[in-house]
């Protein structure tokens, strides 16, 4: 008799998926206002920018932001890698509102107000640490063809303080409510102690902590902070360029992305109840996934190259899509499918923006 009864719970699960609670997904990072424009090669050369890169602004980039606004047709979008991912995840989750939480630091200014408004519009539960020493951070997205060169002027984003925000009980309770955590590697340049506090909490409570390699410079110049948090990472994201730099910095002695994924998966881990999963996207090429004992290649959705408007935010969107299914304990293949879907939507639009409702089934 029991055998006949077995499928019932499964069926029930499909008809009535467990309702998600608010704040089930937690993200923390650098909230930035993206200033994006299609530029020319001369502009990239003038500021010695690579066509497809992410860097932090230096003194030589001081004029870049003004020149971008004066010389090209710019668009303003609420950005910042982790914040983008939270918005995309919330968009795919739809209900409840505020399933995704976001922490970061902004200035008390016009750009800060825009970020607050945009987060509210996206139904993300954003709790910003607001300070008046630095203005809200900006990120110049210099687009040429299918490439985007990002120059981030962190400003206020760099002022996030663990003891002034994360440690406050009213904020920490939101961390405790989450089941899945996501922090872009970028935030390791700002507050590694905040990243570690959240990572440790996740490991101690057997919840899922996820991290992104974010940019080649993180693996190069913030290696210590990155490797301090790596033992807590249950799911590691990155793209092919970041994977290659990470492998070189770690002495993996291979350029094969599947091998790199395997070696990253095998790095020491604190919570032995969860084996690490490593996911490397490669633009239009297959997404490489090291999970359990296999490395699998997942093809991305066929995309008409003419339809691609702006690849900025594609990686963030992939993560957001992935996390939107992970919070409901969907299988890995579904998480990847949602990631690919989200990225395919975002690259057809400027900035990390999306239509009102998703079309993902």
Curated annotation (Swiss-Prot):
Entry binding sites for Mg(2+) 2: 147
Motif (Nuclear localization signal): 7-15
Known tissue expression: Widely expressed. Highly expressed in liver, testis, kidney and spleen (at protein level). In brain, expression in most forebrain structures and the cerebellum is higher than in the midbrain and brainstem (at protein level).
A GO CC term attached to the entry: cytosol
Entries under Pfam families matching the protein: PfkB (PF00294)
Catalysed transformations (reactions): adenosine + ATP = AMP + ADP + H(+)
Keywords from the named record: ATP-binding, Cytoplasm, Kinase, Magnesium, Metal-binding, Nucleotide-binding, Nucleus, Phosphoprotein, Purine salvage, Transferase
CC cofactor note: Binds 3 Mg(2+) ions per subunit.
Gene Ontology MF term list: adenosine kinase activity; ATP binding; deoxyadenosine kinase activity; metal ion binding
Cofactor: Mg(2+)
Active-site residues, Swiss-Prot/TrEMBL: 316
UniProt EC number: 2.7.1.20
Pathways involved: Purine metabolism; AMP biosynthesis via salvage pathway; AMP from adenosine: step 1/1
Residue sites binding adenosine per the record: 34, 305
InterPro entries linked to this entry: Adenokinase, Carboh/pur_kinase_PfkB_CS, PfkB_dom, Ribokinase-like
Binding site for Mg(2+) 1: 48
Residues modified to Phosphotyrosine: 76
Regulation of this protein's activity per its record: Activity is inhibited by 5-iodotubercidin and 5'-amino-5'-deoxyadenosine.
Gene Ontology biological process terms, A to Z: AMP salvage; dAMP salvage; dATP biosynthetic process; GMP salvage; purine ribonucleoside salvage
Record's subunit section: Monomer.
Family stated for the protein in its record: Belongs to the carbohydrate kinase PfkB family.
Function according to Swiss-Prot or TrEMBL: Catalyzes the phosphorylation of the purine nucleoside adenosine at the 5' position in an ATP-dependent manner. Serves as a potential regulator of concentrations of extracellular adenosine and intracellular adenine nucleotides.
Protein name: Adenosine kinase
Gene: Adk
């Amino acid at each position: 008799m029991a055998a006949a009864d077995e499928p019932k719970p499964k069926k029930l699960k499909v008809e009535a998926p467990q309702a998600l609670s608010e704040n089930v997904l937690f993200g923390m990072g650098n909230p930035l206002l993206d200033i994006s424009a299609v530029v020319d090669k001369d502009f990239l050369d003038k500021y010695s920018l690579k066509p497809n890169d992410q860097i932090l602004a230096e003194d030589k980039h001081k004029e870049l932001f003004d020149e971008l606004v004066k010389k090209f047709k710019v668009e303003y979008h609420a950005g910042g890698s982790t914040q983008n991912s939270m918005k995309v995840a919330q968009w795919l989750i739809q209900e409840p509102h505020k399933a995704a939480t976001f922490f970061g630091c902004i200035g008390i200014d016009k750009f800060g107000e825009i970020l607050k408004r945009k987060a509210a519009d996206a139904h993300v539960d954003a709790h910003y640490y607001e300070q008046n020493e630095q203005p809200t951070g900006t990120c110049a997205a210099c687009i040429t063809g299918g490439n985007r060169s990002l120059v981030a002027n962190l400003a206020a984003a760099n002022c996030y303080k663990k003891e002034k925000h994360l440690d406050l009980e009213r904020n920490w309770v939101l961390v405790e409510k989450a089941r899945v955590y996501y922090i872009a590697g970028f935030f390791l340049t700002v507050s590694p102690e905040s990243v570690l506090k959240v990572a440790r909490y996740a490991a101690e409570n057997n919840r899922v902590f996820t991290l992104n390699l974010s940019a080649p410079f993180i693996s190069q110049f913030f290696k210590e902070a990155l490797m301090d948090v790596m033992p807590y990472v249950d799911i590691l994201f990155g793209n092919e360029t970041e994977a290659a730099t990470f492998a070189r910095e770690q002495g993996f002695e291979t350029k094969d992305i599947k091998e790199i994924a395997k070696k990253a998966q095998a790095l020491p881990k604190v919570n032995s109840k969860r084996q690490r999963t490593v996911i490397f996207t490669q633009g239009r090429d297959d997404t490489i996934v090291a999970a359990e004992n296999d490395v699998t290649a997942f093809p991305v959705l066929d995309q008409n190259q003419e339809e691609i408007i702006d690849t900025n935010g594609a990686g963030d969107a992939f993560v957001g899509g992935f996390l939107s299914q992970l919070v409901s304990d969907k299988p890995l293949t579904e998480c990847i499918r949602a990631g690919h879907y989200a990225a395919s939507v975002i690259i057809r639009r400027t900035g990390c923006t999306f239509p009102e409702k998703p079309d993902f089934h």
